[in-house]
Each structure stands twice: as structure tokens, then as C-alpha cells.
Amino acid sequence: MVRYSLRKAHEYARDGENQEVLGEISQAIMYYGLAKSQFEKICQNTAQPLIKRCANNQIEELMVRIRELRESLPNKQTPISMSMSTRLSPMYTSSLTPRFTSNSMVLPGDHNTTVRLKPSFREALMEDSEDDLYQMYSKFEMQVKKLSTNYGLAVAFSIVPMDDDQPSPSIFSSDESFLIVEGDDFSLGNSVEEDANATSKEDPAYQNTNEQIQPLSNFDISQQEYLNNTRIPYENEDLHLQHITQGTTDDNNVSKFLIPSYNDAKELSEEEMGRSHKREESFKRAFGHASSSESSIGEITDSREDIQSNRLVNGSWENNDFTKEINNNFPDRSETPTLQTIEAPTKLMKYTRRKSLFRFPFFRSISGKKKEEPMESGTDSLESSTAQITVDSQLKIKQLETQIATLQKQLEQFQTSTLDQDLH
């Protein structure tokens, strides 16, 4: 039908050319119009099947894509919550590497149990191999459990169903986002130990504020007297000296009050110094503003007592700045020690993760074997020829339209010229 209409259109166009040569412009316009209508009919008859065929091809491609996506989804053995959890934190994810590929997973809400899925045929072959890329790494599992417990992140071992003939476990996965923990990036223990000014957990300055601080063991007063703040104040020099002389005269107890200065104490032997080692550490913490992570409240207050006793034996305090510096670095024993009067030397540093090796999320598009281009069959060749006919017909229509417009102008000019001749 298309070929008949095409032949008929060419005949009309040829007749129009003949009439144009003979001078019958009106007849030529009529034949050109018939040829144009024939070409328009050809375009309509050939374009509709092409559009329908293209739409069917697109629908078929979409159906194939949907089927491939459904096949790439986890099977019934894999919980659905696992695939959901891997998409909750895409910015903390990196591309899948064979090292952390596993066939076990952590169930959400239960961080101590792992589910062992059925091993695939590929894993069965590699079970006896020493270089098993799909084995479970205990350190990685421990880090995942720690993160999921402490930080509440969406961490899980990611599993993709693997067929026997697949070269990788996720070749048909269209949306991959796996959380990979790099070594010691989230090692909480190492980060606290590496802090230079980290304080000890035994430091009472960082204990609960609700806990009552008990009086020190070297006080020679009762607990009730200590709590009522009725003991002798140490700010008065005479009372302080009187309090020292009222104590026992044992050499071991008195020797610590007889050391003239810190520099002289360094030259004495340990038998004469008594607690010289602890006093050296106290001085270093006082004047170097170092951390008191290895000291306790008792050692700090005893060191302050030693400093005051040394200055008192020498006869007078050196200056007020020295007294203020001691009072700022050591708690005042004239008051009940509380967490407000004990100044924390350093605060616990906020945990900051070192520069991570995480990469941006890697979303793999559908990958597989490259489709081979099929050989052109009879229907394909017919379709291509039909499309070519449509294109040629559209070009021919444009040419005929321009030719008709030109002839109409010539016809108008001819009619006007004949009218002028008749008038004359």
C-alpha cells in the first residue's frame, strides 16, 4: 500500500512538471497538490507504526530492567532489615572490597548474635584455601559491634545473593552502600590512652558530684569536727606552728616539716627526705601546670602542707604571689573540700576521630555481559527502509510546498498581466 501510494505521488509530481513546461500553471498546481496529499498519507501510514514500535521497544526494555532489579534483591534467607540498614548512613560508606565481604551479618537490636547464611558453591570451593577472601575478620566484627552499641550507627555486614557462576557477589547490584570500618579509626581505648593530658578515672575531680568526699587519713581530727569546719585554720602562722608542735615528735612524722627548701631537698638522701619523690611530682604539677592523672587528693593536700611548713620554718613567706599560686594550684584545707574548690587541671578532651579513609558512597549501575548486537533480520531491514521512506517523503513535501508557493506567485503575476493587456 505504501509503495503504491509512493508510485502514485511520483506520477502526480511528474504530471505537474509536464503541465508547468507546457505553460498550464493551474493544472501543474493541481497535480502538485495531489502529489503532496499522497506524500502526507505515506508519512501518516509509516510514522504511526514506527511510533508504536518504538514505544513497544521502550516498554520491553523497562520490563527487562525491572526483572533484573528484582532478581538482584536479597533472597528470602536474607532479612529485609539488613538492606535497609545499609542505606541509612550513605555518607559513612565506601565501596565494597573483597576483604570485608562476608556471609554473616549482625541482626539489628542484637549485637551479640550473628546469623550464618548458607554458603555458596564458590565458598565451598574456597573453604580449604588459606587466602579465603570471604572469611570473617574477628577484628572487623568487634569494631562493628562496638560501633552499633556505643554510637547507634546503622552498621551491618552487607550480603548480596551470589550465584555459582558470578565472578563477584554483587555484580548485579544496582544500589550499593556498605559501611567499611578502617582499622583503628574508631578505637575508643587507643584514643583515650593517646591523649597527652588525659586524666585518670580514679581522679575524684571527675567522679560523680553526688558522692561525698571523705576526709583524708592523715588528719588528726575527727570526721564530725572535719565536716563541721571547727578545726584549726592554717592561715594563722602562730596557730599553724602551735598545731605542728602539738603533734607527735616521731622522727618520721616531723622530718617532713624540717626540709628547708625544694632545692636542698633534692640533694638529700631518700632516708632524710621521706616522701621526696612524691613531693617532686607535686611541685612539677604545681609550677608546670601539668596533669595530675597519677595523683590523688591526699597527695595534693599533703604537698600543700609541706610547702607551707617549709616557708614557715624559714621564718617568713617569700611573697604574696607565691601564696596565691599555691592556693590556686592546691585546694584550701581550711574548708571542706568539694568539687567546686578542687580545680580540675585539665578537662577530658572530646573524642575526635582521626582522619578517616572513608570514601564517598559508590553506587554501581547495572553491570553484566555486554549484549551482542543482533544481526539484522527481515523485519529490521523493512523497518529501516520504512523509516527512510518517511524521511524522504517529508523532504519531498517541503520541496513541493515551496514549488507550489512559487507557482502560485507566478500564476498571480500572469493573471495580473493578462488583465492589464485586456484593459489596453
Swiss-Prot record:
GO terms for biological process: macroautophagy; meiotic cell cycle. Residues 268-299 are annotated as: Disordered. InterPro entries: MIT_dom_sf. Changing V181A: Impairs interaction with atg8. Impairs autophagy and decreases lipidation of atg8. Keywords: Autophagy, Coiled coil, Cytoplasm, Meiosis, Membrane. A motif (AIM) lies at residues 178-181. It is found in: Preautophagosomal structure membrane; Cytoplasm, Cytosol. The keyword Lipid biosynthesis does not apply. Residues 50-78, 390-420 form a coiled coil. Residues 268-284 have a biased composition (Basic and acidic residues). Residues 73-212 are annotated as: Required for interaction with atg8. Disruption phenotype: Defective in nitrogen starvation-induced autophagy. Cells are not temperature sensitive and have normal sized vacuoles. Functions as a part of the autophagy-specific VPS34 PI3-kinase complex I that plays a role in autophagosome assembly. This complex is essential to recruit the atg8-phosphatidylinositol conjugate and the atg12-atg5 conjugate to the pre-autophagosomal structure. By binding to atg8 at the phagophore assembly site, atg38 helps establish a positive feedback loop for recruitment of phagophore assembly proteins, including atg8. Component of the autophagy-specific vps34 PI3-kinase complex I composed of vps15, atg6, pik3/vps34, atg14 and atg38. Interacts (via AIM motif) with atg8; the interaction is direct and leads to recruitment of the autophagy-specific vps34 PI3-kinase complex I to the phagophore assembly site. Belongs to the ATG38 family. This is PtdIns3K complex I subunit atg38. It comes from Schizosaccharomyces pombe (strain 972 / ATCC 24843) (Fission yeast). The lineage of its organism: Eukaryota, Fungi, Dikarya, Ascomycota, Taphrinomycotina. The gene is atg38.
